[in-house]
Every structure is written in structure tokens, then in C-alpha cells.
């Protein structure tokens, strides 16, 4: 089966492209029925139609007209593929013919440009930590200034700065730069805050009235109106004046600043498109939201501290930021969190702020690095029509025919609990209990793992030519950056087959399945012990092989997997070793960052993160992919490693010696110079569109940064097993892929089928 075609046309990839016909059979398949879906995938030739979709009037349905619906031109009616209700066709569909078929009856993915108006342009509230060093702050100010040119002219912008206190800047006066100052150690509530800023008590919701000197929305004004004053204030920012005592950290009120930002937007722009863009240069040292004590003698928590219950502030801080995340999500807003320091800032505690709202989490060493500067500006990337690719206020619904129920979703979203949908499963995977989710923001790369359950407990006979299909429809309503409301609709049909049908096994997409299992594992790792998650992965792999491998009992050498299953075990091997599950040598903030990126990317990029790609360059042959194995490291080759998070060029021992000798500068050795350039050119291509920008590492045999390559390799030759002369020895206690496969085969063949 060509799984890539479905992804190219519809942005969807299923683990199983043919479904079992009963719940029991589905459970025996081990890998859940699920798919990876990219709502705003950039589809070549996507049709955008300039009218509203036709919606089914069936009770609790609201599915949209699609190519799988039955059309009856005689009665001018259509039958919904999801609920089978008959609906009246609007008058514009009454003259259907082979030459006059609407796009939505031809294409399985269609985008509607609806007539619903957008009341308020997008809002960008910049929240800037000023406790950082002057050079770091200056670099940040330059990046923010550069980003203003990428925003729509009518965008509303605001500014909050914070250190020990929180400062809310007021640009409503043309001549005076005003600022409201709040205590950094106070947990403000909505009503008192509104009264403080407007002089009036809050009665119900505040309408988006005209801006006045006393209205709450005076803190958000059009970019085209205040850009000059905004930049003036930005440029005048200096390091926080509160002195830092020796042996102490700066006083930093991140929690209070975020709280005030969220309340301010809630007060005047609830359920309108808004981003809170936070730039932090260290951990919160003031309650509410305190991450670490003021005294430097008390180090910030590690994974070991969290696991052993010694992270004294961790649970309280996480509870505070989770509450903030729920409120911001409910208000329809987004949080982006950018870190620019060597220290941790508390991303582990604050991660739900971005994960529940569709925001960006970025970990960098400084605001002056290329990784921050380019990644931050790529957030505002534009399409060919010069509109920002980011979208706002998204609502994602999954409709399914009676054969299926929705178990849940794993990705950057929040559940809509109040729903009349009837296709919700009793069992939950990820964010469940609903078939509708919200995202304050959507980017084209945002991809969601959606899981399904077979509704029928008993077997449904599927025989003869009467092919039974299960239908799924993904509906994404969102605000486009052009100022329009759009609806992206994708409808797919999957065949149902009885237990034991060879079509089910043939329909297995091992790449999509590996990513779906990985998403579940990462989701489990948030609440379960690491070894328990590893055991779950191992049990899943063993059960799948027991079900679909060919073997003779008690004979490991007879073990065989079909081609579309053969790579799945090695994906699981590299998943077990990945930084998503193996947190040794990573800080909690790094783990939060890695997991955040992993749970938003598509199948291809996710696989690169699980099992990085390795390309070999040599004088004797063309560049070629090689095994991610210590045996691939040779003295006369250059290796290019792509882990998604960093791209590394490794020069073998001989190549490194030639380079140091300067052979590339001698015209006689033009071929060698070309060899050195080849991996750089390929690396540059990988860097062009990736978000966030990966770290680039250039190293050689014996170099200190060669460890970044060696840590990713399968240790075919370790200090425990030094068989191959001339091979690179990897100093690790990790089991090799070969031994892992032997253990797997033994576990499978020694267990009763």
C-alpha cells in the first residue's frame, strides 16, 4: 500500500489502513487503531472554495458534505456518510452533472473560506524578562524589533516587562510613556485587576469598546499606530535595577507576569486570537510560580530530585502553571515560551502553558544565538501570498461513522468536554472523553495522534462484494492570518475486515505505528516511572511479533517478519534509548523541550527524532545512507548525522588529518576539497525550513563533540564486545541492536501463541 499518497493528499497516516471488524480483534492487533493527522498540512493543489460548507442536519452529527456521500439528484437530497441521515441539497447543487461536480464531491480534502467575520485582528503581547545581562537583553530587543516587520499592520500589540516587579506599558498617550507597576509576589485576580486599571468595577464581560484613556483594551493598540513608540520603549529597556545580593539569584516574577498577561487578555479579548510571547532568562524566584529558591546554594531541581520527592517547589509550581494553562486555553489564547540562558527556567513546570494552547517552547543558551534569532523569526514565516503561516483560535473535530469511536488525541491541544457527540469511547488514550479539541494556535507542522476504537463488541461478518467501510471526517475551523475564518475538511474511508484477514496485516504502516506507539510512550512518561514505560514498550513489541511474525516454537532462528513489520523492532530499540524516555544527562527543562517538539511533528520528522539518519561521504563512492551503527564510523569517511535537534558532521581520523594538513587548499587535491564541502551543502539544505533551527556541530575523530554522534550509534562494538578490528569502540553499557533482536526472538518463540 502507498501510505505516502494518503499523507500527501490528506495529511493523514494510519497505523492500520484496514480495520478489524470487532473490538476484540482490534485489541488483539496490539498497536491501536490510530492515525497521524496534520490539520493545516501544506497540500499541493489544495482547493480553497469561497463559500460555506454544507452541513448534515442529523442529530449530533454536523458532518460536512464529502465525496463519500450518496447524492440523489431526483429528490435533490444527499445521504451523510457519517450518520446515514438524508439531507436536502441546497439550490446551488440542483444542476449536478458529470461536467458540473463541486470540488467537495471530488476531493477528500477541501478548505472553505467562510463568510463568518473576524471581529478583532490578532493580538501579540510581548512579555520580557529584564533581569538578564545587558548584551543578552540587547540581542533580544533587536529580535523583537525585527519581528514587528513580519506582523500584520493592523495587529494589536502590547508589552509587559518584569523583574522583581511587573510593568504593564501603556502606549495610548502620544506624548507620555506610561507604565502600570504590579507587585511581583502577588497573585492577582481578574476583578481587582480590572478595577485597578479602569477605575470601575467589573460587571460581566467587558465589551471590545472603543479605546479610551480608561478602557482595558488601551494596552493593545494597532502596530501601525504605535510601532515607533513601541520600539522607543523597547530600546530604552535596561537590566532590572533591583540589586542582586552576592550568593543570590535575581528576583524574577515570571509567574506573576504570566498571570497578569492572561488576566488582561481575558478581561478584554476573551475568545479572540492572541499570543502571549514570553522571553525568560532564568527561573522564577518569587511566588506565585516559584521554581527555585533565591539562594544559589540551593540548586535547581534535577530529574533525580523530582523522582525522589526532593524537588520542594516542583508540584506547587506545576499546579500553579497548569491552572494558568487551563485558563489561557479556555480563553482561546496561546503562550510561546522562549528561554535564553544556560540555566533552567522552569520549562518542566510550565510546559502545559504551551502544550495546551498550541504554543512554541524553545530552549536556547542565549538570545544572541543563531538558534534563537532564526527560530523566533521563523515563527512568523509567511506563505506565497505574504500571509503568516500561523493560524489562530482553532477548533478540531473528529466525526466517525457508527463502526468507530474516538479514544483520544495526543498533541498540543485542550479537550472540549461539553459535547453532544456520540462517537466517544469509554477507553481513553491521551486527551480523551471528547471528540473535539481547541488549539489557541496552529502551525502547518502541527500534527496530532488520533486514536480510535471499534464500537462493536462482537464480530461483524464482512463477506462477498459488499465491502464495509468505516468513515472518518476531520474538521478544523480556524482564523487565517489574512483575517478570514476557514474550515479545512478531510474525509477518509477505511475498509473493515473480519478476524484473520491477510488484508489487515498487509495494511500495516510500520512507520506511522512506531510514531503512534512513541507518542503513547511519551505521554505515559509524563506520569509513570521510566522503567515501567520501557517495559510497556517491550510487552507491546513482543505481543505484536507473537501475532504477526512467522516462527517455530522454541526455535529463534526460524523467526521472520514481513517487510512491512521488519523495521518496527528497531524503531522500538531506538525509542527506548532516546532522550524522550532516557533522561540521564538531561535536565528536566531539556526533557520538556524534546518531548514538546516530538509531540507536534509529523511521521517523517518524528522518525528522524527516534532513529536519526546517517549519511556517509567518501572519495570512492557517492553519498549513501548507512546504518546508525558504530561499524559505520570509518577513518576515511565523513558522516552526516541528522537527529532533528542537531545536525553533525563527523570527520574520520584520516580525513581529519588531511584537513589539518591543509590538503584542501592545494589545487592538486580539488576532489578532497569537494568532499569536505558535500556534507556542508547537504546540512545547509536540512537547515533551510526546519523549526526550530537545529544546532550545527562540526567535529572529528577524537574531538570532544564526537560524543554527540557516538551516543546515538548502535554499539555493535563496545568495550564489552571488541570484535571488529579498526571499528570505533563505543563506551556504553547499552545493549546492542543485535542482542536486543536476539532477546526479542527468544521471548517470542518461547511463549505460547
From Swiss-Prot:
GO molecular function, one term: GTPase activator activity
Listed GO biological process terms: COPII-coated vesicle cargo loading; intracellular protein transport
GO CC annotation terms, alphabetical: COPII vesicle coat; endoplasmic reticulum exit site; endoplasmic reticulum membrane; Golgi membrane
Coiled coil: none
Subcellular location: Cytoplasm; Cytoplasmic vesicle, COPII-coated vesicle membrane; Endoplasmic reticulum membrane; Golgi apparatus membrane
SUPFAM superfamilies assigned: beta-sandwich domain of Sec23/24, C-terminal, gelsolin-like domain of Sec23/24, Helical domain of Sec23/24, vWA-like, Zn-finger domain of Sec23/24
Keywords: Cytoplasm, Cytoplasmic vesicle, Endoplasmic reticulum, ER-Golgi transport, Golgi apparatus, Membrane, Metal-binding, Protein transport, Transport, Zinc
Residues that, per the record, bind Zn(2+): 56, 61, 80, 83
Topological relation to the membrane, as annotated: Peripheral membrane protein
Assembly notes: The COPII coat is composed of at least 5 proteins: the SEC23/24 complex, the SEC13/31 complex, and the protein SAR1.
Role description: Component of the coat protein complex II (COPII) which promotes the formation of transport vesicles from the endoplasmic reticulum (ER). The coat has two main functions, the physical deformation of the endoplasmic reticulum membrane into vesicles and the selection of cargo molecules.
PANTHER family: PROTEIN TRANSPORT PROTEIN SEC23
Family that this chain belongs to: Belongs to the SEC23/SEC24 family. SEC23 subfamily.
Protein name, entry field: Protein transport protein SEC23-1
Organism: Candida glabrata (strain ATCC 2001 / BCRC 20586 / JCM 3761 / NBRC 0622 / NRRL Y-65 / CBS 138) (Yeast)
UniProt lineage: Eukaryota, Fungi, Dikarya, Ascomycota, Saccharomycotina
